[in-house]
Structures are given as C-alpha cells and as structure tokens.
Amino acid sequence: MIDCRYYQQNECRSCQWLEIPCSQQLTEKQYHLKQQLISINYDEAQWVAPFQSNQQGFRNKAKMVVSGSVERPILGILKNPNDPQSAIDLCDCPLYPTHFSAIFSILKDFIGRAGLVPYNIAKQKGELKYILLTESIATEKLMLRFVLRTENKLPLIRRELPKLLEKLPHLEVISINLQPQHAAILEGEQEIFLTEQQFLPENFNGIPLFIRPRGFFQTNPKVAAGLYATAQQWVAEFPIYNLWDLFCGVGGFGLHCAKALQEKWGKPIKLTGIEISSSAILAASHSAKILGLEHVNFQSLDAASVIENKNENKPDLVIVNPPRRGIGKELSEFLNQIQPHFILYSSCNAMTMGKDLQHLTCYKPLKIQLFDMFPQTSHYEVLVLLERKKIN
C-alpha cells in the first residue's frame, strides 16, 4: 500500500482503492470487465494477463487548483469547490514524480512575484484558477499552463518569465489559458503561448508524439506505451494494408500500427485518421512526417462523418478509441456494413464498450487485455481485437 498522508488524514480520497492490495485490484477489475462482456461470446477469445502499472509516481500530469493567498498559494484541491478554506495542498502527492514537489515550490514563488492572486469562486474575485503541469518521459521537458480569469496579469507574467526559465530550464511550453467564467470549469477556449514551442514532444516505442494544450493524452506513460505496443503486436500478425483510426487524437494507435505493418509486410500502408480537434490533427500529421509515412491522411472531422462518405476505399482494419460514451449504435452498424477484416477497440469504459460489441454482430473477439491505467481506482483501459465472422 502507498504511504499517503493525505489519504491517512482523510484530506484526499481520490484514490478510493488505496487500501486494497494491487493484486486484488486487478482481480476485481478483471471480474468487472468480464461482467460487461457477459452478453457476447468470448469463449474462443484469448484473455491476455492484465498489464500492470507502477503504483506511485506514474502520472505525467498534475492538475492543481490554486487557492490560498498570493503570498501563500496552495496548490492541490478544494474539498468543497465553493469554500476556499477547504483547500488541501497536494504538492507531495505520491502519484506524481517526486521531483514535481520542487517544481511546485518554484511555481509558488513565481505566483507571488507575478502577483497572480488565487481565484476565489465564492467571492468571484482573483485571477489564477489552475496550474497544469505535464512532463514528457522521453525528453524530461515540461509543459506549464496557467489558467487565468483575464489577461490583466500578462505583462507581469512576461516580466517574471526569464527568472522562472532560469530556475526551470526544462520548461519547453508555457501558455496562458483564459477561463473567464465564474464556475469550476478547468479551462477556456483561448490559449496564449509565451514560448515559441506549442507542443511537448513525447516518444513511445520509437513513435514520436506531441502533447498539446487542451488536448487529450494518457496520464500514465508506462501503461500508455504498453497499450500502443500491444496494439502494434496484435495487428502486425495480419496482412493489413489499409487502416482507419477513428477518434485518433494525436495518432498514437494509427501511427504505431502503420509503422509496424509497413516493417512487417514491406509494403506502403494507407492510414486515414479522423479526429475532431484540428490541433491534434496537426500533431498527428507532424508525427507521420517524422516517421516517413507517406500514405497518411489525418482529417479534422467528427468520427461519425465516415458514415456519410461511402466512396472511401474500404479498410482492412478500423481502430476505434472513443470517449466514455462509446461509438454508439449508428457507427457500430456502419462497421457491420463495410465489414473490415478487423476492428481494434480501445476503451476507458467497459460498460459502453460491451454495449457496442453487442451491436457489432458481424464480429467476434480474438484477444482481450486489461490495462491498469488508473491504479488505486476502479477505472481501467481495455483493448479488444475483433475479427469478422466467417460466413458459412
């Protein structure tokens, strides 16, 4: 069990399963997963042993609510979002890398120097709402974002920035996110960059990826790298030359699979990636260029748009990595119609995935594996490889 004083003192209970042994956590998650898939026939599927995570220091990202005063800022959580007195400082949270604590200390000093008054949601006063810190495990570089109510403190921030960079030379990306609403909303629409670099370079399994502000990226790098590597291994067994990556984000799944397939079969691989975020598409396209993948087309579209495009060359493999709501009945039925040989489904919500698999009536599961992306909680990631059923 992790030695966490915040949990022991009942200050933070985000890790609801902290007192449950790691082996039991995995057993319960595996049982839960099988219950969600009980309505589909997985008897012939290969159940791969769960991919385990480190139990502490595994997070590459910290989301810190800023409270307290400008002279004594508190970085952590508010147990009651409307009560600044309920603030808990989580700078020594054991889920973060140990060196984050020293970084937070430097940032507290910066808050005072730049006059960034912590926002008080009850009084609707103040400027600084959150500090968001992300680290690349490949480069050890950092992305730092200040979520502010207004631009009023921007001149002071710019004035103090050189001193901050002296103390934290690994800062690669620094930005201001403006969130003017008087509500406990994490971030707003506008991002102001204070550095030339706007993406944080990362690398999993030799695949360059780019973390962007306001974009989704897994917070457990070790398990995320394992998830992508597993996807690579599973699909490389088959002669796949045309794949779609729906909900592709910055291209993690599609790029891993395309690279592995090209190396295995020695032929150009056609990859089409669909993602609603234009900045994610820019990042994915940049990664593909670095890898030298030529037959790649990343498009900023809603994943549902593929249903309307009937003229696309039919894929051999479709990768889906949807948000918690799943892919839904309409997209499931579309996949039944176009019948790719394989579907690779990655999910953070086994319940909605189970419903989707019921709709994918033309497919049977070949392989299933749980990934312990979120230790100390009931949450997990799951990867399923589906094969088109043979018609008798």
UniProtKB/Swiss-Prot annotation:
EC number(s) reported in the record: 2.1.1.189
Keyword ATP-binding annotated: no
Keywords linked to the UniProt accession: 4Fe-4S, Iron, Iron-sulfur, Metal-binding, Methyltransferase, rRNA processing, S-adenosyl-L-methionine, Transferase
Cited CDD domains: AdoMet_MTases (cd02440)
Example of a GO biological process term: rRNA base methylation
Annotated coiled-coil segments of the chain: none
Keyword field contains Disulfide bond: no
InterPro entries given in the database record: 23SrRNA_MeTrfase_RlmC (IPR011825), MeTrfase_TrmA_AS (IPR030390), MeTrfase_TrmA_CS (IPR030391), SAM-dependent_MTases_sf (IPR029063), U5_MeTrfase_fam (IPR010280)
Domain of life assignment: Bacteria
Binding site for [4Fe-4S] cluster: 4, 12, 15, 93
GO terms of molecular function: 4 iron, 4 sulfur cluster binding; iron ion binding; rRNA (uridine-C5-)-methyltransferase activity
Residues annotated as binding S-adenosyl-L-methionine: 218, 247, 275, 321
Reaction equations catalysed: uridine(747) in 23S rRNA + S-adenosyl-L-methionine = 5-methyluridine(747) in 23S rRNA + S-adenosyl-L-homocysteine + H(+)
Catalytic machinery residues: 348 (nucleophile)
Protein family per UniProt: Belongs to the class I-like SAM-binding methyltransferase superfamily. RNA M5U methyltransferase family. RlmC subfamily.
Biological role stated in the UniProt entry: Catalyzes the formation of 5-methyl-uridine at position 747 (m5U747) in 23S rRNA.
HAMAP family xrefs: 23SrRNA_methyltr_RlmC
Protein name (database record): 23S rRNA (uracil(747)-C(5))-methyltransferase RlmC
Gene this chain is encoded by: rlmC
